[in-house]
Amino acid sequence: MQFSKMHGLGNDFMVIDGVTQNVYLTEDVIRKLADRHRGVGFDQLLLVEPPYDPELDFHYRIFNADGSEVAQCGNGARCFARFVTLKGLTNKQDIHVSTAKGKMVLTLKDEEKVRVNMGEPIWEPAQVPFTANKFEKNYILRTDLQTVLCGVVSMGNPHCVLQVEDINLAPVNELGPLLENHERFPERANIGFMQVVNRNHIKLRVFERGAGETQACGSGACGAVAVGIMQGVLDNNVQVDLPGGSLQIEWEGVGHPLYMTGDATHIYDGFIKL
């Protein structure tokens, strides 16, 4: 099976063409491929499939390193767009794809940058999903470690975002797994730790569902900015600094789609026997 290794700000992916190859992946196979010592190694595996809808260009599937399938990955979406272009699967500048939970438009800006229409943030608790009687800008979550105030949103996948004073001191690996698996998130959640530098600039670390802390999380950056705007601490155009680099996030507010712009880097092509 042919594949490419790619990354978006250090969030790394194994990308597989399922259009010209017959690909069958089980959770066990994905976990073996994800092993950084005995396999390829990656945060997520991205699978390009033919479109389910004839009006779209491709179907986009995402698998975490633990083998679980998820509905969204923003950094992966940028790499997906770069991959299908590099492999000659399309020559379009605007690439229309479906995911497990909706549709996206991926726009190639230049040799490195890709702009992604991530759709509208979803706030209704039942659709996140998150257990709550109604939408609130802030929720209180209790864990064995501490009680936190957080915002909750879905960008096609669930995000819990809490503000911290100093991003370097944030208890990402201690509090992250407790919140990821909190009983109020029936499908678990991605946990964002956000330091607000000013109204147009944040620093962010993300403990990703099924992957742990990564160098960057595109949908996490989108979720953090959306929460910050809803809470009134951020403006509509925000630079997000992650351990692996920076993203630019734009959102005009409720009723509008959110846009993410950032790099997508091809590392190498490979072949592996399954």
Swiss-Prot record:
Keyword field: Amino-acid biosynthesis, Cytoplasm, Isomerase, Lysine biosynthesis
Transmembrane stretches, start-end: none
Compartments in which it is found: Cytoplasm
Keyword presence, Transcription: no
One of the protein's GO biological processes: lysine biosynthetic process via diaminopimelate
MF term (GO), any: diaminopimelate epimerase activity
Annotated site residue numbers, Important for dimerization: Y268
Cellular component annotations (GO), alphabetically ordered: cytosol
Residues of the active site: C73 (proton donor), C217 (proton acceptor)
Domain of life: Bacteria
EC numbers for this chain: 5.1.1.7
PROSITE patterns named in the record: DAP_EPIMERASE (PS01326)
Site feature (Could be important to modulate the pK values of the two catalytic cysteine residues) residues: H159, E208
Reactions accelerated catalytically: (2S,6S)-2,6-diaminopimelate = meso-2,6-diaminopimelate
Family matches, as InterPro entries: DAP_epimerase_AS (IPR018510), DAP_epimerase_DapF (IPR001653)
Sites where the protein binds substrate: N11, Q44, N64, G74, N75, N157, N190, E208, R209, G218, S219
Subunit description: Homodimer.
Similarity comment: family membership: Belongs to the diaminopimelate epimerase family.
Protein name: Diaminopimelate epimerase
Record lineage: Bacteria, Pseudomonadati, Pseudomonadota, Gammaproteobacteria, Pasteurellales
